[in-house]
Design a protein with these regions (language model features):
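Membrane-embedded helix-loop-helix hairpins and adjacent transmembrane boundary segments
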Residues: 1-487
Length: 487
């Protein structure tokens, strides 16, 4: 970027606004209840924006947008699922019941809700332990997305981008708790909404309009690399061939894994507990639906259309364009490259703030969940002293932050969408059955809930590590133990 003075001015204004909102959260955080569920009296508009911005992160924009650059508009089915399942079903069938159950039991966290309902300390601690281990991987994917864009925009090292980006987030989560998180999430979601609308409009303008852009994308089907075509890729405007490897990956991992897994996301379920009545959840539904439609629909459409831009300007498809400096193709660089090359500088600045907002809003919710799992649900002394619990949860934020940094430096390239889908799939497999039972099936026993969670965890890990080819190859455990990529 050439006009750095303008950008630094925008960034300074952004950071000042975040700092003020974080301070506002800090001023209103006087108890563990304030830190964990924002006092339970948040306005539904703020809750909807916080829910949407926590759900939609850089993994949705950069990771899944990049995946759309590879697999095309088939990812728009994920948009359908995120609205139908992630908003309508989530708010109507899960949000109201969750809020009523949480307030009736007087609980503050998702693991505590399951453990208290089934009268099982094992369920509470098993849930918290699983979140403590698995959520930093998802958080690392989000952090990687933000750092990658900063790396491309400022031409600085990935390590420096990661440290700087992460340091800003940890400060306001540490001091502001969930109140600070919700205040900043609402502000960031507004930036995200308008930033994505502008990017979509300029993308169509760059490519000659809506009709011309999609016709050009449809006409590029013959440019699909043979390696992808042999696995079922049928072009960027078509679904992959039914039953092929790519079809299974797109449908089972990306679309269904995330589209259904959203129902059992602990950091989202906590949002239902922050409003003062069940009626407020219904009032929040429209705002949440519009926001998520804009975020996912734009990201996946722009990701697919980036192929048209790169083909017109360099004769390459997006996947080939992401091979920078002799390195292999990196799906996570498709969206940053497209924005950097195709958009005016002021849009690049705005989009950088959009990505910062997306990443920070999601990471703040993730760090908050990790901290409460570590310091409250896994701590036998938690809850005995309100002031002490607040201190412990803030210490848990630091520990979650360090775990996430470790994963952010160790995960391989092109990992953002996959790591996100893995976490969502894990939550769907382990938490969704017992979560649904707690809300709708009172006859479920404690032992049944325990074995459901343990059995689902073991089965999910078996499928991921030994059966599903893409994930098994990533972890490499099956090949090390048995000499083959999958069983």
């Amino acid at each position: 970027m050439e006009n750095m003075t303008l950008f630094y001015g925008m960034l300074a204004g952004y950071i000042i606004a975040i700092a003020l909102l974080g301070y506002l959260g800090y001023r209103h955080t006087r108890s563990a209840e304030d830190f964990m569920i924002a006092g339970g009296n948040v306005h539904p508009f703020l809750m909807a924006l916080a829910y949407g911005s926590t759900f939609i992160s850089t993994s949705a924009i950069v990771g899944f947008g990049g995946a759309a650059g590879v697999y095309g508009l088939s990812l728009l089915w994920l948009t359908v699922f995120t609205i139908l399942v992630g908003v309508f079903i989530a708010f109507v069938f899960y949000g109201r019941k969750t809020r009523e159950l949480a307030h009736g039991l007087g609980i503050k966290t998702f693991p505590e809700m399951l453990g208290t309902y089934f009268d099982s300390s094992f369920i509470r601690r098993f849930s918290a332990g699983l979140l403590t281990v698995a959520m930093p991987i998802y958080a690392a994917a989000v952090m990687i997305g933000g750092a990658r864009f900063i790396e491309e925009s400022f031409h600085i090292s990935y390590q420096l981008a990661l440290y700087g980006f992460a340091s800003i987030i940890i400060v306001y989560v540490f001091f502001g708790g969930l109140r600070g998180v919700i205040y900043t999430d609402a502000f960031q979601s507004i930036i995200m909404f308008f930033g994505m609308i502008i990017v979509l409009g300029l993308t169509y303008w760059q490519l000659g309009g809506v009709t011309a852009a999609h016709e050009s994308l449809g006409a590029m089907h013959h440019l699909v690399p043979e390696g992808l075509r042999s696995l079922g890729h049928a072009g960027w405007t078509s679904m992959p061939v039914f039953g092929t490897e790519i079809w299974w990956y797109v449908v089972s991992t990306l679309v269904l894994g995330v589209g259904i897994g959203v129902l059992a996301q602990p950091q989202l379920a906590v949002r239902y507990m922050t409003v003062k009545s069940s009626r407020e959840i219904y009032r929040a539904m429209l705002v949440g639906g519009i926001f998520i439609l804009c975020m996912t629909g734009v990201a996946f459409t722009v990701g697919a259309l980036s192929n048209v831009y790169f083909h017109k300007t360099s004769g390459m498809i997006s996947l080939s364009a992401s091979e920078i400096g002799g390195a292999g193709a990196n799906v996570d660089k498709i969206i940053p490259l497209f924005i950097t090359q195709a958009m005016p500088e002021w849009v690049l600045m705005l989009f950088l703030l959009t990505l910062l907002s997306a990443a920070m809003s999601t990471l703040s919710g993730q760090f908050h969940m990790i901290s409460t799992s570590l310091a409250y649900d896994l701590n036998p002394a938690a809850g005995e002293n309100d002031r002490q619990t607040l201190i412990w949860t803030r210490m848990g934020t630091i520990m979650g932050f360090l775990l996430t940094l470790i994963f952010a430096f160790s995960l391989p390239s092109s990992i953002i969408a996959l790591a996100t889908a893995l976490f969502f799939g894990l939550c769907a497999a382990v938490f969704l059955p017992v979560y649904t039972a707690a809300l709708y099936w009172p006859k479920v026993t404690k032992s049944g809930a325990i074995w459901s969670m343990v059995g689902s965890t073991m089965l999910y890990l078996y499928i991921v590590l030994f059966v599903h080819e893409k994930e098994a190859a990533l972890f490499g455990i099956c090949e090390k133990l048995f000499g083959v990529k999958t069983l």
